[in-house]
């Protein structure tokens, strides 16, 4: 199995992220998908697979995930034309709930601070 250097792997992941960030809004024009933002790309060591982590604003994550999965093959073929490398990784889309989780944690912290301030003022 051929493995690539971590530096090359990261450069390729960054390039795939830039290209997909340009291709997805153009190729998945449905307004019902909301705003899809690519958070990160994780490549397998042999570059055969790419986990594409995304968030979505203004739409249900499940709906966006389904649309991305349905277009994965087409997006793969478009990447092949752009990247000029022998093997383009197979795309696997994953919803990244960490942003949502962070917002919820921030809300809970704000709520706890407000509650403490109210208790101190009594």
UniProtKB/Swiss-Prot annotation:
GO biological process: maturation of SSU-rRNA
InterPro entries: KH_dom-like_a/b, RbfA, RbfA_dom_sf
GO cellular component, one term: cytosol
Superkingdom of the organism of origin: Bacteria
UniProt KW Transmembrane helix keyword: no
Cellular compartments annotated: Cytoplasm
Gene3D superfamilies recorded: 3.30.300.20
Keywords: Cytoplasm, Ribosome biogenesis
GO MF annotation: an example: ribosomal small subunit binding
Assembly and interaction partners: Monomer. Binds 30S ribosomal subunits, but not 50S ribosomal subunits or 70S ribosomes.
Family named by the database record: Belongs to the RbfA family.
Physiological role: One of several proteins that assist in the late maturation steps of the functional core of the 30S ribosomal subunit. Associates with free 30S ribosomal subunits (but not with 30S subunits that are part of 70S ribosomes or polysomes). Required for efficient processing of 16S rRNA. May interact with the 5'-terminal helix region of 16S rRNA.
Name under which the protein is recorded: Ribosome-binding factor A
Organism whose genome encodes this protein: Polynucleobacter asymbioticus (strain DSM 18221 / CIP 109841 / QLW-P1DMWA-1)
């Amino acid at each position: 199995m051929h493995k690539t250097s971590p530096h090359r792997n990261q450069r390729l992941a960054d390039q795939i992220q830039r290209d997909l960030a340009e291709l997805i809004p153009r190729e998945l024009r449905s307004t019902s998908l909301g705003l899809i933002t690519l958070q990160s790309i994780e490549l397998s060591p042999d570059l055969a697979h790419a986990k594409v982590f995304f968030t979505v604003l203004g739409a249900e994550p499940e709906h966006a995930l389904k649309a991305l999965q349905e277009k994965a093959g087409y997006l793969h073929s478009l990447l092949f034309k752009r990247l000029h490398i022998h093997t383009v990784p197979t795309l696997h889309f994953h919803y990244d709930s960490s942003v949502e989780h962070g917002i919820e944690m921030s809300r809970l912290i704000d709520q706890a601070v407000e509650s403490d301030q109210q208790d101190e003022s009594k």
